[in-house]
Regions:
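Short, intrinsically disordered terminal tails adjacent to the first/last structured region
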Residues: 1-24
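Hydrophobic, aromatic-enriched alpha-helical segments typical of multi-pass transmembrane helices
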Residues: 20-237
Length: 238
């Protein structure tokens, strides 16, 4: 009798455990909430960046958002640097968390997992940016550029590469509408990047660059918007 009762009890407990065991691919409620919290970080990251480039020029009387780059806002000796550096670091941390959220949302979509990994890499590399600032234009024109300027350029190129790759893999991860949107985003990034790059020699020579800041901000803006759209799409995914 004891053996019979013991076996029955074991079957009951086993059935109870099976009833609470998540189905393969199913996310626990607590895990789902954590994932959504990480995805919201993507939206917050874009808002932080926009707020930074909107507020920082107020600390620099002669700064022009149309003709000067974002990098100049945290250049060596820039009056806005003390504000921009912590905000940019916050932005990068939020992007890393968003990348983890994208990774956790990938399921069996390998392309989306790659997007998450690229966004994490983008954020990690971005954390180094404020520690390798450029010099102000006047210093560069006087030949006072150093290794930090070179490193800043390398970091920027790596970030752009991660950005383009993330959008490219993202285009393959979701539906047709998001794919077309991602392709349009890449095209805008390429055009904006070329226009910004053409003015780079003039920046170093401290010559007028009347539209350089605008082209760069359009470039940055389309990526920030893409991040928000991706976050919203994943937040609404089952």
């Amino acid at each position: 009798m004891d053996k019979t009762n013991s076996a029955a009890t074991e079957r009951t407990m086993s059935a109870h455990r099976e009833g609470h065991r998540p189905v393969h691919g199913q996310i626990r409620p607590s895990g789902r909430m954590a994932r959504k919290g990480l995805l919201v970080c993507g939206i917050l990251s874009s808002l932080i960046y926009v707020a930074t480039v909107a507020l920082a020029p107020m600390l620099w009387e002669n700064y022009s958002s149309t003709s000067q780059t974002v990098s100049e806002l945290f250049a060596i000796g820039a009056p806005s640097r003390p504000l921009v550096v912590p905000l940019m670091l916050t932005y990068d941390v939020l992007v890393i968390e968003f990348g983890l959220g994208v990774w956790g949302s990938a399921g069996r979509k390998r392309a989306l997992r790659v997007v998450g990994g690229l966004l994490v890499a983008y954020g990690v590399v971005g954390l180094a940016g404020p520690f390798f600032p450029i010099h102000l234009r006047e210093a560069l024109a006087a030949g006072e550029g150093t290794l930090t300027d070179t490193m800043h350029g390398i970091i920027t190129m790596v970030l752009v590469l991660f950005m383009l790759l993330a959008i490219g893999f993202g285009a393959a991860a979701l539906g047709k509408r998001f794919r077309l949107y991602s392709i349009a985003t890449i095209l805008m990034l390429v055009v904006g990047g070329v226009l910004t790059g053409l003015d780079q020699p003039r920046l170093v020579a401290n010559l007028p660059t009347p539209w350089m800041g605008l082209w760069e901000r359009i470039n940055i803006g389309v990526f920030l918007l893409w991040v928000v759209v991706l976050a919203i799409a994943l937040l609404h995914a089952p």
